[in-house]
Amino acid sequence: MFINLNPLEQFSVYSATSAILGSSSNSLAITSLTNIAILFIIGLLVLTIFQISASSHLIKPTRWNIVLETWVASILGIVKDQIGNDAKNSLIYFPLIFTFFSFVFISNILGMIPYSFTPTSHISVTLGLSIAIMIGVTLIGFSKHQLDFFSLFVPKGTPLALVPLLVLIEFISYSARAFSLALRLTANVSAGHCLFGVISMLSVSACMAVSSILLKGITIGLPLAVLVVLYGLELLVALLQSYVFTLLTCSYLADIVNMGDH
């Protein structure tokens, strides 16, 4: 007996109130208890990775230690390249950047498990991260530069008559960073998963539509080979999107931290 399981079900959001009360009416939440639990588990994994990498002092490191050290060194390299080689800034902002990279990467990897939930495929998760980043960046700007922070919206040498227009344009551009950061991650993660789902469902439908054993083997084997290749590409995309998210976050921080140097 064939059980119809929709691979795109991982993109569905069920409210916490309907999960508890068994009713979809008068919903007070948009994120299910399962999704909250997964986000909590990801947070614990990030903390565990950071703790292990920080407390490892083995004379002969294991393979796991080497992977973690490479992970940490790579993120630290991104921070230094974008924000600067100043040791103080690197130590201040590295834990934040490392946490964001680890959270996004682990979320993407967990989404590669069939029928699992992919947090970064939901705009509510990525937009929450990006808005928090931009609020934090803005607060850092005010803390470091006080009122000079507003000079970010007025390029040097701007004619006085063009100041109001350029301030408006720069402010919109600055505010749009949060939305572009969130949409870029969500769109790229969702696209690959949707392609997986479409190919899987078409393969199952084609297999059920034919009666020949040979044709059934072809309709299953060929899409399966394509899915294996796509799976490898999606693993690369998961890493690449984590890197892009981290790189852009560092870039936004660098604009604020090094504002007085330009």
Swiss-Prot record:
PROSITE patterns xrefs: ATPASE_A
Pfam families: ATP-synt_A
Record-linked InterPro entries: ATP_synth_F0_asu (IPR000568), ATP_synth_F0_asu_AS (IPR023011), ATP_synth_F0_asu_bact/mt (IPR045083), F0_ATP_A_sf (IPR035908)
Transmembrane segments annotated in the record for this chain: 30-50, 64-84, 91-111, 123-143, 149-169, 195-215, 220-240
Major localisation: mitochondrion
Alphabetical list of PANTHER family matching this protein: ATP SYNTHASE SUBUNIT A (PTHR11410:SF0)
Protein name (Swiss-Prot/TrEMBL): ATP synthase subunit a
Organism: Allomyces arbusculus (Aquatic fungus)
